[in-house]
Curated annotation (Swiss-Prot):
Keyword set includes Metal-binding: no
The keyword Ribosomal protein is assigned to this record: yes
UniProt GO MF annotations: structural constituent of ribosome
Family: Belongs to the bacterial ribosomal protein bL32 family.
NCBIfam families: rpmF_bact
Organism: Thiobacillus denitrificans (strain ATCC 25259 / T1)
Protein name (database record): Large ribosomal subunit protein bL32
Residue ranges, annotated region (Disordered): 1-22
SUPFAM superfamilies on file: Zn-binding ribosomal proteins (SSF57829)
Domain of life: Bacteria
Length: 59
Protein backbone atom coordinates (compact mmCIF):
# COMPACT_ATOMS: atom_id res chain seq x y z
CA UNK A 1 0.00 0.00 0.00
CA UNK A 2 1.29 3.48 -0.86
CA UNK A 3 2.31 5.60 2.12
CA UNK A 4 3.42 9.21 1.90
CA UNK A 5 6.89 10.02 3.16
CA UNK A 6 6.13 13.50 4.50
CA UNK A 7 2.90 15.09 5.65
CA UNK A 8 1.44 17.63 3.24
CA UNK A 9 0.81 20.97 4.97
CA UNK A 10 -2.65 22.60 4.77
CA UNK A 11 -1.23 25.22 2.41
CA UNK A 12 0.18 22.64 0.01
CA UNK A 13 -3.02 20.61 0.27
CA UNK A 14 -5.00 23.69 -0.74
CA UNK A 15 -2.66 24.40 -3.65
CA UNK A 16 -3.04 20.81 -4.83
CA UNK A 17 -6.85 21.13 -4.81
CA UNK A 18 -6.94 24.58 -6.40
CA UNK A 19 -8.20 23.27 -9.77
CA UNK A 20 -10.76 20.77 -8.46
CA UNK A 21 -13.67 23.22 -8.37
CA UNK A 22 -16.52 23.07 -10.89
CA UNK A 23 -17.26 25.90 -13.29
CA UNK A 24 -20.50 26.83 -14.98
CA UNK A 25 -20.70 25.93 -18.67
CA UNK A 26 -20.02 28.79 -21.07
CA UNK A 27 -23.26 30.05 -22.61
CA UNK A 28 -23.61 31.84 -25.93
CA UNK A 29 -26.51 34.02 -27.07
CA UNK A 30 -27.93 33.37 -30.52
CA UNK A 31 -27.96 36.71 -32.40
CA UNK A 32 -31.09 35.94 -34.46
CA UNK A 33 -33.37 34.66 -31.68
CA UNK A 34 -31.67 35.96 -28.52
CA UNK A 35 -31.78 32.53 -26.87
CA UNK A 36 -28.94 31.23 -24.70
CA UNK A 37 -27.36 27.89 -25.58
CA UNK A 38 -24.17 25.96 -24.90
CA UNK A 39 -21.15 27.08 -26.91
CA UNK A 40 -20.61 25.06 -30.12
CA UNK A 41 -24.15 23.64 -29.93
CA UNK A 42 -27.25 24.62 -31.88
CA UNK A 43 -29.96 26.68 -30.18
CA UNK A 44 -33.35 25.08 -29.39
CA UNK A 45 -34.79 26.74 -32.51
CA UNK A 46 -32.23 25.05 -34.77
CA UNK A 47 -29.96 28.07 -35.35
CA UNK A 48 -26.15 27.99 -35.22
CA UNK A 49 -24.11 31.17 -35.63
CA UNK A 50 -27.02 33.03 -37.21
CA UNK A 51 -27.94 30.35 -39.76
CA UNK A 52 -30.83 27.88 -39.68
CA UNK A 53 -29.19 24.43 -39.72
CA UNK A 54 -31.98 22.11 -38.53
CA UNK A 55 -35.68 22.17 -39.32
CA UNK A 56 -37.94 22.27 -36.26
CA UNK A 57 -40.72 19.68 -35.91
CA UNK A 58 -43.45 22.29 -36.46
CA UNK A 59 -41.99 23.61 -39.72
Amino acid sequence: MAVQQNKKSPSKRGMHRSHDFLTNPALAVEPTTGEAHLRHHISPNGFYRGRKVVKAKGE
